[in-house]
From Swiss-Prot:
EC number(s) reported in the record: 4.3.2.10
GO biological process, one term: L-histidine biosynthetic process
Assigned protein family: Belongs to the HisA/HisF family.
Superkingdom: Bacteria
Major subcellular location class: cytoplasm
Pfam families: His_biosynth
Assembly notes: Heterodimer of HisH and HisF.
Protein name: Putative imidazole glycerol phosphate synthase subunit hisF2
Subcellular location: Cytoplasm
Gene: hisF2
Length: 248
């Protein structure tokens, strides 16, 4: 049985690690080096870093990525601003284990296939941001709502060779009120690839609810920096509820 992963997912902005609320209202978490050391000490399963400056400017902060990778002793996923196979190669060469693509996948789905064929599906994470509009779930990209079904898009990504899906609820992101369970229900039992749910994790019980609706991994930021809970706390509750986790 595959073990459920607990994954801090934080943003890189101006050389600092930050968290946000609905992709705005940024709050600094800490310096790259010190934050990495905290994650290492807490034995988190993986770490996702999304470079939001690169997502806007297209200029990837390779220097910060290198600094992160040097201090990171867990599987590391890097996203933001990736446009070419050469970008992926450089990020992997700097020490990342996986890359996350969002806007580029929307623009050119064949890029997913090219990346998967060259580097292997196991290191290609496709990311979909979702926001509600009039009771419907829409794909959200760089401030725009797209008339696309998040589930249909995810299924297309899967066919193209994505190895995992990172699904983020923009409405719930940073709110610490639990995951968007209605969104998760749409995806329940629909994908063959692992689904990482992100946005809203506030306590271990939120994780239990998400896993019961088919999530394979739990991502979050607020809970691990601005609450009393640690990744170990979440894992211990999941283990009590019968989920397989990595406990040290």
């Amino acid at each position: 049985m595959l073990k459920t992963r607990i994954i801090p997912c934080v943003l890189l902005k101006n050389g600092q690690l930050v968290k946000s609320i609905e992709f705005k209202d940024f709050r600094t978490i800490g310096h790259l080096t010190s934050t990495m050391r905290i994650y290492n000490a807490r034995n988190v399963d993986e770490l996702i870093i999304l470079d939001i400056d690169a997502s806007k400017s297209g200029e990837i902060d390779f220097e910060s990525i290198e600094d992160l990778a040097k201090e990171c002793f867990m599987p590391l996923t890097i996203g933001g601003g990736i446009k070419t196979l050469e970008d992926i190669q450089k990020i992997l060469n700097l020490g990342a284990d996986k890359i996350s693509i969002n806007s580029k996948a929307l623009e050119d789905m064949d890029f997913i296939s090219k990346a998967a064929n060259r580097f292997g599906s196991q290191c290609i994470v496709c990311s979909i941001d979702v926001k509600r509009k009039g009771g419907q779930f829409c794909v959200y990209d760089r401030g725009n709502l797209l008339e696309k079904s998040p589930l249909e898009l995810a299924l297309e990504y899967e066919k193209k060779g994505a190895g995992e899906l990172l699904l983020t609820s923009v409405d719930f992101e940073g709110r610490a009120k639990g995951y968007d369970l209605e969104l998760l229900k749409i995806f329940q039992n629909k994908l063959k690839i692992p689904l990482i749910i992100n946005g809203g994790l506030s306590n271990p019980s939120d994780g239990v609810e998400a896993l019961n609706l088919g999530a394979d991994a739990l991502a979050g930021a607020y809970i691990f920096h601005f609450s009393k809970y640690t990744p170990k706390d979440v894992k211990e509750e999941l283990a009590r509820q019968g989920f397989a986790v990595r406990l040290l």
